[in-house]
Amino acid sequence: MEKKIVFITGASSGIGEGCARKFAMNGYRLILNGRNVEKLAAVKRELETEYHEDVCLLPFDVRDRRAAAAARESLPEAWNAIDILINNAGLVIGVDKEHEGSLDEWDVVIDTNVKSLLAMTRLVVPGMVERGRGHVINMGSIAGDYAYPGGSVYCATKAAVKALSDGLRI
């Protein structure tokens, strides 16, 4: 039986790295994405050494749709049938009140937390539909249900992640 392939965005640290470790521990092949090539390479070395699983790196900024599409297209044939997509890349910057916040910072948060999730889903899910199987895990946050002072934009993006996840199931 062929090992399943998991594609994880934001895999160079934190929750994404933790997911990579858990899936490697359980015998999955991994496609890891992140912006920091050195950190990704270190994660790859650790996982291959500790768990002896195949790891493919796709370093790019998920906000860059062209880079995402080019990375997806660059995958060797043996890595094309992605079974699980984990949209984990995300960030929070700025904790200003809405009437004081930076539109540029908000663009970065929205582009990373919402639009990149849509773009990655659009790049990967058609193959899942074609094969009749696959799973998408979108990392949300309790902040999507409960706003906190200065966090309204981040909280709104996490509420959007929840709504998009619900919509994807339909």
What is the predicted function of each stretch?
Residues 12-14:
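Conserved glycine-rich cofactor-binding loop
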Residues 28-42:
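Conserved glycine-rich Rossmann-like NAD(P)H-binding loop of the short-chain dehydrogenase/reductase
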Residues 37-38, 59-70, 103:
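The beta1-alpha1 cofactor-binding region of Rossmann-like NAD(H)/NADP(H)-dependent oxidoreductases
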Residues 99, 148-152:
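Active-site loop immediately N-terminal to the catalytic Tyr-X3-Lys motif
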Residues 121, 157:
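Active-site helix of classical SDR
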Residues 141:
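Residue(s) in the substrate-gating loop at a strand-loop-helix junction
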